[in-house]
Amino acid sequence: MSKLDLNALNDLPKVDRVLALAEPNAQLETLTAEERVAWALENLPGEYVLSSSFGIQAAVSLHLVNQIRPDIPVILTDTGYLFPETYQFIDELTDKLKLNLKVYRAGESPAWQEARYGKLWEQGVEGIEKYNEINKVEPMNRALKELKAQTWFAGLRREQSGSRAHLPVLAIQRGVFKVLPIIDWDNRTVYQYLQKHGLKYHPLWDQGYLSVGDTHTTRKWEPGMAEEETRFFGLKRECGLHEG
C-alpha cells in the first residue's frame, strides 16, 4: 500500500480520522512490536522520531526502535528536575545504544520559573498543567517542528493506567502520526525483553519506584497504590505529552 496521507487525514474531523485508521489498527493489533515498527517505516511518512522520558522501562522502546531504525532522533524533554539517577541512566543508555539524543528544554530555566510562578507543582491541577505546558508540551511541539517529524514513536502501554487502557497502536496527535509499538505489552513481556537483550530497568526500580518523572511529583509505590497514583500526587497520570 502507498504511504498514508497525513495532510488528508489532518483535514478530517477527529472522529473521521479515527475511522480512517480503523483498518490499519486492526492489522497492527495482530503484529509483533518489531513488525509494527517495520510497518510504520514502510507505510507512514518520515521524518521519524522516538520520544522517551528515560523512565523505568525506557530501555525497551529505545532498543527496539533503534535496532530497526538506527540513528532515529530520540527526543527528551528535560525539565531540569529529573532525578540524578535519571540523568545517569540517560548517559548510560545513550552510550550503550548509540542513541541520537535530542534534548529540548523550556525557554525559562527552572530557577526563573520558580521566581515568576512559584512552585507550580504545589498549586493543584491548574499549576501542574501550567508546569507541564511550559516544560513538556511546548518543548515537545518545538522538537516535532524542528525535526520535521511526521511519524512519532513512543513507548506507552495500556497496562500503565486507565488513561492509556484504550489507546490504539496508531493515531494522529499534534498533527503527526503516533505509533505505540509495545502498547499491548504487560510487565512480564517487558521484563523478558530486558533480560533477553541484556538491558536494565531505571536504577530507581530497585528502590520501589514503578514510574519516574520529576523529583517533586514522583512517589515510591506503596501497597494498595495503583501505578498512576505515584505521579502528580494522584491528581493526573499524563504529563501533557500524550494528551490531545
Swiss-Prot record:
<dbReference type="GO" id="GO:0004604">
    <property type="term" value="F:phosphoadenylyl-sulfate reductase (thioredoxin) activity"/>
</dbReference>
<comment type="pathway">
    <text>Sulfur metabolism; hydrogen sulfide biosynthesis; sulfite from sulfate: step 3/3.</text>
</comment>
<keyword id="KW-0560">Oxidoreductase</keyword>
<dbReference type="GO" id="GO:0019379">
    <property type="term" value="P:sulfate assimilation, phosphoadenylyl sulfate reduction by phosphoadenylyl-sulfate reductase (thioredoxin)"/>
</dbReference>
<comment type="similarity">
    <text>Belongs to the PAPS reductase family. CysH subfamily.</text>
</comment>
<dbReference type="GO" id="GO:0005737">
    <property type="term" value="C:cytoplasm"/>
</dbReference>
<dbReference type="InterPro" id="IPR002500">
    <property type="entry name" value="PAPS_reduct_dom"/>
</dbReference>
<dbReference type="GO" id="GO:0070814">
    <property type="term" value="P:hydrogen sulfide biosynthetic process"/>
</dbReference>
<protein>
    <recommendedName>
        <fullName>Phosphoadenosine 5'-phosphosulfate reductase</fullName>
        <ecNumber>1.8.4.8</ecNumber>
    </recommendedName>
</protein>
<dbReference type="InterPro" id="IPR011800">
    <property type="entry name" value="PAPS_reductase_CysH"/>
</dbReference>
<feature type="active site" description="Nucleophile; cysteine thiosulfonate intermediate">
    <location>
        <position position="239"/>
    </location>
</feature>
<dbReference type="InterPro" id="IPR014729">
    <property type="entry name" value="Rossmann-like_a/b/a_fold"/>
</dbReference>
<keyword id="KW-0963">Cytoplasm</keyword>
<dbReference type="InterPro" id="IPR004511">
    <property type="entry name" value="PAPS/APS_Rdtase"/>
</dbReference>
<comment type="function">
    <text>Catalyzes the formation of sulfite from phosphoadenosine 5'-phosphosulfate (PAPS) using thioredoxin as an electron donor.</text>
</comment>
<dbReference type="Pfam" id="PF01507">
    <property type="entry name" value="PAPS_reduct"/>
</dbReference>
